[in-house]
């Protein structure tokens, strides 16, 4: 039992000891056999939210007693909370200081950009004369169409790819002909789970050859340092 407690993140260990939460959304790092672990989670009446194979992670929702049982399983390497990341602040005063020389002639024709953000509204500058929002995946509300209930993602996509038609070319993005592949991993309050971000990254990397994705925009930050979680990003 002592060795199994070493598999627990200190913050999660504290919460389990205090019994302050009924269900926990957690990240489970496994050695092998993710299907077997997923089966165990379901047998404990837990919910497997997603599996991120690139970094050997299962995201699940479990009760405290079930987490303790799962720790005894040899293929479970480490368990921590699925913490929130937040979108970076963006203001008009900051954005207005950006100047791009017209001599650079960057258009991005034939190139795609991945964006992990709060979504993207199908603004005229991104959809006319043809729609350049090629992919939209909603990990928050599972809606099938592009939208943005925060605004941050639309602003980000506009800076990257807006063609300026709605403003008579006054407000034009860096590369106004690139195609956008957007994963909505952040909610209307600008918060997103690490598991959703890692899943989005994994998917965009997998798609990169097919869609010629050369850049992935990650406009978010962590409120505190967690070595384990940061190593997961490195493993991708």
Q: What role is predicted for each listed range?
A:
Residues 88-93, 142-148:
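Short, charged, surface-exposed secondary-structure boundary motifs
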Residues 15-30:
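Short glycine-/aliphatic-rich beta-strand segments at the starts of folded cytosolic domains
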Residues 27, 185-236:
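Substrate-binding/access-modulating region of protease and related hydrolase catalytic domains
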Residues 33-34, 63-64, 118-122:
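Short, polar loop motifs at secondary-structure junctions
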Residues 73, 159-163, 203-207:
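Structured segments of extracytoplasmic/periplasmic soluble domains
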Residues 102-115, 119-135, 143-195, 211-214:
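Subtilisin-like serine protease catalytic core
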């Amino acid at each position: 039992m002592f060795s199994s407690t070493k598999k627990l993140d200190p913050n999660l260990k504290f919460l389990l000891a205090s019994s302050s939460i009924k269900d926990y959304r957690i990240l489970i790092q496994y050695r092998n056999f993710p299907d077997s672990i997923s089966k165990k989670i379901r047998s404990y009446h837990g919910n497997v939210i997603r599996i991120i194979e690139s970094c050997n992670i299962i995201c699940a929702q479990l009760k405290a007693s079930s987490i303790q049982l799962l720790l005894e399983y040899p293929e479970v390497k480490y368990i921590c909370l699925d913490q929130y990341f937040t979108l970076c602040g963006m203001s008009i005063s900051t954005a207005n200081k950006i100047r791009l020389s017209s001599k650079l002639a960057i258009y991005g024709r034939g190139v795609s950009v991945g964006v992990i953000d709060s979504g993207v509204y199908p603004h005229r500058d991104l959809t006319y004369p043809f729609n350049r929002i090629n992919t939209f995946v909603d990990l928050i509300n599972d809606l099938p169409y592009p939208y943005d209930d925060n605004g941050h993602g639309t602003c980000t996509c506009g800076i990257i790819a807006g063609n300026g038609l709605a403003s008579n070319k006054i407000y034009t993005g860096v590369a106004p002909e690139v195609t956008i592949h957007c994963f909505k991993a952040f909610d209307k309050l600008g918060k997103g789970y690490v598991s959703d971000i890692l899943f989005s990254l994994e998917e965009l990397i997998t798609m990169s050859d097919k869609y010629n994705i050369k850049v992935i925009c990650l406009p978010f930050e962590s409120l505190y340092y967690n070595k384990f979680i940061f190593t997961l990003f490195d493993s991708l």
